[in-house]
Every structure is written in structure tokens, then in C-alpha cells.
């Protein structure tokens, strides 16, 4: 692609003082034939001299990346900090995933590079696909509640999320961006350690932070999280529940009963 063609496609990249396209990676916008203006990153590399017939002309190799999904996630973060964020492609393979809290398990259950449906309750797959199809048809984000499968060390979770379909320049689904805002056990497992982990995740507080604010040792909190201690002393339960802004019975029903 010649510099003149690039100037016509991306007029914002140029000024009277800078007639040549800069090398490297830059952020700009692109107006596709379908939909709204897209935010992109564009890497430009000048190509070697090709011959006498191209004398005086500069050609570039351009690698452009659509940043629409990332920008949507950034915008969502200004409203509220999500528990999880991610991007999956049009085949539902997760290409980006980030968890904003301490892991609920010592085992890695990240869905990265796997189908998102491998982690969701099979009984809800068709319902979820229908909701995604409706959101895509209407070109709108949608709120959705999904349930995950259970693992040996983690009970199934119920998650409330917002999903946004992202289109390519021709109007086809390119990917989906998602933010998870809330989670809880899909069914009561009766495991206080799991309840504690979930409430700590929802309150965005780590083991070390909870230890510092309550005066309870990190070792004790870790044992409570891992289920090695299932019934703490009442004062310990009160301090933790107060810091997490929940009732004692939300985590330890037996301790909460007088």
C-alpha cells in the first residue's frame, strides 16, 4: 500500500508538519463499510525498494488489529470493576480472559484457548446461544445469567454477566466481549470455605488484605478458605463477616446460630 492511499484511509494520521507515515505501532480509527467507527492499532513497516519503476514511492506493510472488544471492556470498567472479563471469537473459543480476584481453586480452571461452552452447564447451551443470536441481530449488548459446570474442587457457580457482540467491517460476528459482575454458588454446597472465597472475590479483597484489616493471621484465613477449618471461633467469624459486609450465617450458618 502506498503512502498516498494510507493518507486517504487514515487522514487523522497526517498533518502538514508530518507528511510521512511514522513507523511502529499507533492507535487510530477506521470507518468500515458496516457499523460504527472502529478503534484499531496499526503497525506500519516500510517495504524495501522494489525497482526503478517505483522510484520516489514508499510502500508499507500494514498490520491492523481491531480493538473494539478491548475498548468496550475498558468502557465497562469505568462503570464498575468486573469480577471477570474476556473475549471469545465467533466459534466461542476464549481468546482473552482475566480474573480480578484470588483464584477459587489451587487448580487452573482458566477457559483460555478453550470453548466457553466447555465450562457452562450443558442444559443451558441452547438458551445461551439463543440469547447471543438475539443480541447479534439487534446489535446490542445483553445481560445474561449462566451456570458453570462443577469441578472436583469447585461447585457449580451462577454468574451474572453482560455480553457484547463485536462485528467485523462486513457485518458478520467477529467476537464477543463479556464482563462478569456477580457470582454465587448455583446450589448450596454446604462448604463454608467456598462461600468465603466467593464473598472475598465479590468484595475484591485478598487474603493478605483481610488479614491486615481483621488482625487474623494469613494462615488461619487460608485454612478457612481451603476448608481445613470449617467452624471458626465466633469472634473470628464476626470479624471476617463484618469486613466482608455480610451476615455470619451467609458463610458459617452453624456459627451464626446462638
Language-model-detected regions and their locations in the chain:
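DNA major-groove recognition helix of helix-turn-helix/homeodomain DNA-binding modules
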Residues: 235-250
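Recognition helix of helix-turn-helix/homeodomain-like DNA-binding domains
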Residues: 216-231
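PAS/PAS-like sensory domain cap-loop motif
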Residues: 1, 100-112, 246
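Sensory modules in modular signal-transduction proteins
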Residues: 68-104
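A short, Lys/Arg-rich alpha-helix, primarily the initiator
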Residues: 181-205
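Short loop/turn elements at sensory-signaling interfaces that couple input to output
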Residues: 42-60, 161-176
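Terminal output helix/cap of sensory domains in signal transduction proteins
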Residues: 2-36, 120-150
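PAS-associated C-terminal cap
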Residues: 65-72, 182-186
Amino acid at each position: 500500500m502506498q503512502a498516498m492511499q494510507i493518507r486517504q484511509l487514515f487522514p487523522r494520521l497526517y498533518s502538514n508538519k508530518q507528511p510521512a507515515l511514522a513507523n511502529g505501532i499507533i492507535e487510530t480509527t477506521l470507518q468500515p463499510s458496516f457499523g460504527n467507527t472502529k478503534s484499531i492499532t496499526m503497525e506500519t513497516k516500510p517495504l524495501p525498494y522494489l525497482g526503478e519503476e517505483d522510484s520516489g514511492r514508499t510502500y508499507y506493510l500494514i498490520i491492523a488489529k481491531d480493538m473494539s472488544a478491548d475498548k468496550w471492556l475498558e468502557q465497562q470498567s469505568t462503570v464498575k470493576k468486573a469480577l471477570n472479563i474476556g473475549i471469545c471469537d465467533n466459534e466461542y473459543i476464549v481468546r482473552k480472559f482475566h480474573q480480578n480476584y484470588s483464584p477459587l481453586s489451587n487448580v487452573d480452571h482458566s477457559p483460555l484457548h478453550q470453548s466457553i461452552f466447555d465450562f457452562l452447564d450443558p442444559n443451558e447451551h441452547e438458551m445461551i446461544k439463543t440469547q447471543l443470536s438475539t443480541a447479534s441481530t439487534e446489535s446490542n449488548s445483553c445481560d445474561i445469567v449462566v451456570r458453570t459446570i462443577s469441578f472436583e474442587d469447585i461447585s457449580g457457580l451462577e454468574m451474572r454477566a453482560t455480553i457484547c457482540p463485536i462485528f467485523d467491517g462486513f457485518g458478520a460476528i467477529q467476537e464477543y466481549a463479556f464482563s462478569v459482575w456477580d457470582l454465587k454458588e448455583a446450589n448450596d454446597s454446604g462448604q463454608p470455605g467456598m462461600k468465603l472465597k466467593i464473598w472475598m472475590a465479590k468484595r475484591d479483597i485478598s487474603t493478605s488484605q483481610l488479614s491486615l484489616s481483621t488482625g487474623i493471621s494469613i494462615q488461619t484465613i487460608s485454612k478457612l478458605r481451603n476448608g481445613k477449618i470449617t467452624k471458626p471461633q465466633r469472634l473470628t467469624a464476626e470479624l471476617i463477616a463484618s469486613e466482608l459486609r455480610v451476615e455470619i450465617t451467609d458463610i458459617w450458618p452453624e456459627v451464626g446460630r446462638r
